[in-house]
Amino acid sequence: MTDQPPSKDLIWSIGIYGGKSPFDLHPLPDVSNPILTCRDVTSTPAKFVADPFMIQADGTWYLFFEVLNQQTNKGEIGLATSETGHNWVYDQIVLTEPFHLSYPYVFEWNGEYYMTPETLVANGVRLYKATDFPTQWSSLGSLITGSCADPSVFQYDDRWWMFTCSTPYQHDTLRLYVADEIMGEWREHPASPIVEGNKRKARPAGRVLVLGDTIVRFTQDCVPNYGTQLRAFEISELTSRTYVEKENPSSPVLSASGHGWNALGMHHADAHLMKDEQWLACVDGSREVSLQRDHNHDARAAHIKA
């Protein structure tokens, strides 16, 4: 979630959903959402938690997420763990920088763990590698430079690809980059920008899924406000020269509930296929809070530009 000027007082929390497909996600009967809030963060005075990504290693689930530090007003990357993927325990802050961090897109490649968090304030996309997974991370350098919100990296057809929003305060332009090697030369795709001037389908909203010949990207629908709901697009053709996508008929796949922890919006999903052929996803949601309530407890205000 991009560091933005204040205009609306929201609080973001993290939940767990499941379903028979990544387009059919819903609350699970044995999960009490939200599974993680700012009150669970014991090592940092947190305003909110958001942008969750999870990965399983050696039988344990690891959840990485943005923690907005109330004292510095900068994002840091937090960690929680779970044996089942349903019940989570906060662990610690695992990555801080002098600038704002969010959207900790974590992935495994060749037996090593990497992360491309949003490093917009540092004018680019940085790649981090775990030197001692899951708690120690080191920067390997920048993949691309410029205004890049919510960078989403994935492998397909022996290449690396990256979606990112280049208008982080308007949420209306989606760009696509491609590289032969992750630390190699990244070039903008000929079809990029994929989306321009449309707040409903430009800003990335979680892990890109590669399902055989079909690629699924989740996107924020920022109408009427930032982070209102999630849409899903299926990419049926992706080459070094061409790009074809269509919206999944189930869109929007996640929306505001109208009450509780996700009353006002949902803007993120990281979905994983489980052994029982069901999907498990970490998601986030927002609700408005009163400025008169105790900001040191569950009413810590988060300032997000609508």
Residue map of PLM features:
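Carbohydrate-active catalytic/glycan-binding domains of CAZyme proteins
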Residues: 1-306
